Design a protein with these regions (language model features):
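Signal-transducing coiled-coil linker helices
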Residues: 2-38, 47-57, 107-108, 120
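Conserved nucleotide-binding and Mg2+-coordinating catalytic segments in signaling enzymes
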Residues: 30-50, 71-85, 93
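Alpha-helical scaffold within the catalytic cores of cyclic-nucleotide enzymes
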Residues: 96-97, 128-146, 176
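Active-site-proximal structural segments of metal-dependent nucleotidyl cyclase/transferase enzymes
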Residues: 51-83, 99, 110
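Active-site-proximal alpha-helical element of nucleotidyl cyclase-like catalytic domains
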Residues: 87-108, 116
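Heptad-repeat coiled-coil signal-transmission/dimerization helices
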Residues: 48, 52, 91-92, 96-99, ...
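Catalytic-core segments of nucleotide cyclases and related cyclic-nucleotide turnover enzymes
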Residues: 126, 130, 161-194
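A short pre-motif secondary-structure segment
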Residues: 108-111, 151
Length: 194
């Protein structure tokens, strides 16, 4: 009888452990889903804000350079209004694929909201940041969108280097102001904060 009870306990323990394991996997999957944008697969704004705070702490500790690059698709409302939201999604996905691919060795790409995206660069010098940003911008401008039967959708970018002691909000605002300057200067360009 004792052997039977032991076998029964082992069987239930195994089932319980499998259930806990399955629950943990589901929980981790849900946590990942909460951190990613469902359309693009990029990390979302919440993830960006958390990563930005961590980057500031790391940069303050190590003295390494860090940059924010904010991208915005130029005249995106016109794309949605003229070609429909599903084609607008095609445009967003195309840019996100480029952002993810070009930034993978230097930082992380995020969807900040709507047609606005961010790359958070770590331990990198400005010339390399500019190369990555300009590669994305140029490739996006030349990308052929079949639904339009041409290319020519552009994006603008604002870049800011982290300054020692700066808050996350101040750092982001400097990059955002640079983006605004790029838009004001005619779009399809990059402006670096001074």
């Amino acid at each position: 009888i004792l052997t039977f009870v032991t076998c029964l306990l082992n069987m239930h323990t195994k089932e319980l452990m499998e259930s806990i394991g399955n629950f943990t996997v589901r929980q981790m999957s849900l946590m990942t889903e909460l951190r990613k944008d469902p359309l693009t697969g990029l990390y979302n704004r919440r993830s960006f804000e958390e990563s930005l705070e961590k980057e500031i702490l790391q940069t303050e500790e190590t003295g390494e350079k860090a940059y924010i690059a904010i991208f915005d698709i130029d005249h995106f409302k016109n794309v949605n209004d003229t070609y429909g939201h599903s084609n607008g999604d095609v445009v967003i996905k195309a840019l996100c694929k480029m952002l993810k691919e070009k930034s993978k060795d230097y930082g992380l790409a995020f969807r900040y909201g709507g047609e606005e995206f961010v790359i958070l660069f770590s331990n990198i010098e400005l010339p390399k940041v500019i190369n990555v940003v300009e590669d994305v911008r140029t490739e996006f401008r030349c990308y052929y969108f079949q639904f339009m039967n041409n290319s020519g959708i552009t994006c603008s970018c604002g870049v800011a280097e982290y300054s020692k002691g700066e808050s996350a909000k101040a750092w982001f605002n400097r990059a955002d102001n640079s983006l605004y300057q790029a838009k004001e200067a005619g779009r399809n360009r990059t402006v670096v904060s001074e």
